[in-house]
């Protein structure tokens, strides 16, 4: 087994388009991207779509869009817009490389390193029942000549192509860049399938062929792929191909130290985006699930990561997906954005609720200065801005008691008249407090008999947000209209 490989770094992220992009997949993509860019290499996007029943164009579109949202730009692979091949080592979809796998399988068959196996499912089950389910399959066809097998194929019988392992009696040892030395005894696996009876290749075979022909120098992937490595090393050896270096990353675990599952919250990048997580925060958070900054920083941009990323700092132990910390981290990224940029991110969430808010950039910036400290995710803006939306203003049943007080009508009348007399469209916090004092002077009302009716006339309920912060963001005409609505209920 040769270990000589090009020093020019080439790595890949190879998702299957059978669902969404999970945060674990996003972390794999990020580490490969950082490693490539840190070492002046290339990051390739390959699509492993040989599972015809489950692979969909919709899933592929979703995975590609999520990678684009995260900002992980690849150098070769499917085009992010057209999904067509871009690069000299394509096709980049395994479903378009079937002829390549067939050629390599034919070579292994001719060299006696693989064979056609005509065992049926029934044959295999019988052997398992007799030998025990943990025994390796022993095919009666492993010593057939290729000519014998080809003659039988002419009769219409179906066969898989199996890799022959019986002569490989030794340990397979490699240095995992995350876990150190890993040793596999060859008898861990029996003769494994390369091509199914319909000609479709299996994962381990495609993976080796593609990684070799696409000149991959390093393979960084999740720990769950570690058992696949033995079969892959055997194929590399049989083909006399150089092996890339491997690194297997620890699993991401939930708070109960179980494998992360969508049952306990969002784990799909698209869902996180819809909830209002920023791409920069997602990358920051997943980067620290198994890797640590040498300076101990918790808030990092991709630029920061690129300056210090070293694969040797990956931890082989499972990383906990702490959702509370994730929200906190998103809040730090959110609050660090310039107001104009943050408004662009917030606006789609407000638009979903059909909010009719001022378009003046100065007003938008002022409102964000007020609300930013209370936002952890972008969706938090919805409830913060709702009181400012005239379409959302309703007087709730909880205001009924306040509206029945004898003093309420005088308070609301004074409030409305002072609003109408105010010389400008908006007022400052100081002007609001003075106006509130003037209502007190005119009506003699104080305490809850002063504050609660005014709050009902502003937000539709007697308890809630501080008016001194909300009122300066509200147009005079809006405040007057709300006061009139409240007065009509007295």
From Swiss-Prot:
Write out the entry's keywords from A to Z.
Aminoacyl-tRNA synthetase, ATP-binding, Cytoplasm, Ligase, Nucleotide-binding, Protein biosynthesis
Q: What is its main location?
A: cytoplasm
> SUPFAM superfamilies, alphabetically?
An anticodon-binding domain of class I aminoacyl-tRNA synthetases, Nucleotidylyl transferase
Q: Which GO terms describe its molecular function?
A: ATP binding; glutamate-tRNA ligase activity; tRNA binding; zinc ion binding
Q: Where is this motif: 'HIGH' region?
A: 15-25
Enzyme category, top tier: ligase
Q: Which GO terms describe its cellular component?
A: cytoplasm
Give the residue ranges of motif 'KMSKS' region.
Answer: 259-263
Relate the protein's function as given in its record. Answer: Catalyzes the attachment of glutamate to tRNA(Glu) in a two-step reaction: glutamate is first activated by ATP to form Glu-AMP and then transferred to the acceptor end of tRNA(Glu).
Family of this protein = Belongs to the class-I aminoacyl-tRNA synthetase family. Glutamate--tRNA ligase type 1 subfamily.
Q: What is this protein called?
A: Glutamate--tRNA ligase
Question: What is the source species?
Answer: Bdellovibrio bacteriovorus (strain ATCC 15356 / DSM 50701 / NCIMB 9529 / HD100)
């Amino acid at each position: 087994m040769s270990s000589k490989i090009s020093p020019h770094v080439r790595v890949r992220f190879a998702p299957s388009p059978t669902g969404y992009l999970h945060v674990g997949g996003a972390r794999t993509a990020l580490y490969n991207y950082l490693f490539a860019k840190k070492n002046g290499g290339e990051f390739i996007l390959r699509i492993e779509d040989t599972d015809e029943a489950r692979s969909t164009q919709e899933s592929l579109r979703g995975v590609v869009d999520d990678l684009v949202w995260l900002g992980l730009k690849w150098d070769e692979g499917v085009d992010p817009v057209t999904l067509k091949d871009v690069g000299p080592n394509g096709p980049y979809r395994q479903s378009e490389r079937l002829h390549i796998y067939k050629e390599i399988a034919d070579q292994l068959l001719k060299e006696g390193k693989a064979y056609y196996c005509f065992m049926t499912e029934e044959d295999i089950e019988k052997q398992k029942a007799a030998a025990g389910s943990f025994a390796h399959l022993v095919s009666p066809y492993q010593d057939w000549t290729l000519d014998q097998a080809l003659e039988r194929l002419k009769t219409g019988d179906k066969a898989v192509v199996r890799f022959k392992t019986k002569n490989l009696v030794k340990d397979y040892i490699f240095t995992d860049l995350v876990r150190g030395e890993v040793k596999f005894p060859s008898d861990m696996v029996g003769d494994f399938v390369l091509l199914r009876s319909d000609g479709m290749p299996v994962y381990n075979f495609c993976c080796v062929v593609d990684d070799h022909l696409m000149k991959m120098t390093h393979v960084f992937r999740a720990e769950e792929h570690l058992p696949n490595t033995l079969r892959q090393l055997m194929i590399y050896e049989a083909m006399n191909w150089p092996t890339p270096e491997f690194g297997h990353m620890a699993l991401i675990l939930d708070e109960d130290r179980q494998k992360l599952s969508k049952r306990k919250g969002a784990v799909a990048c698209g869902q996180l985006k819809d909830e209002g997580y920023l791409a920069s925060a997602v990358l920051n958070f997943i980067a620290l699930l198994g890797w640590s900054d040498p300076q101990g920083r918790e808030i990092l941009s991709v630029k920061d990561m690129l300056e210090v990323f070293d694969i040797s700092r990956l931890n082989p132990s499972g990383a906990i997906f702490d959702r509370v910390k994730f929200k906190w981290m998103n809040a730090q990224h959110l609050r660090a954005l310039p107001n104009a940029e943050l408004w662009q991110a917030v606006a789609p969430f407000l638009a979903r609720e059909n909010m009719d808010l001022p378009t003046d950039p100065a007003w938008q910036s002022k409102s964000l200065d007020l609300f930013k400290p209370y936002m952890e995710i972008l969706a938090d803006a919805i409830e913060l801005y709702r009181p400012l939306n005239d379409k959302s203003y309703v007087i709730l049943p909880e205001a009924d008691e306040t509206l029945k007080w004898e003093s309420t009508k005088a308070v609301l009348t004074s409030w409305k008249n002072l609003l109408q007399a105010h010389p400008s469209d908006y007022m400052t916090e100081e002007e609001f407090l003075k106006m509130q004092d003037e209502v007190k002077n005119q009506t003699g009302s104080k305490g809850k008999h002063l504050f609660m009716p005014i709050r009902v006339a502003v937000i539709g309920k007697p308890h809630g947000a501080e008016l001194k912060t909300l009122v300066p963001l509200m147009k005079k005409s809006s405040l007057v209209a709300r006061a009139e609505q409240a007065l009509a209920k007295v």
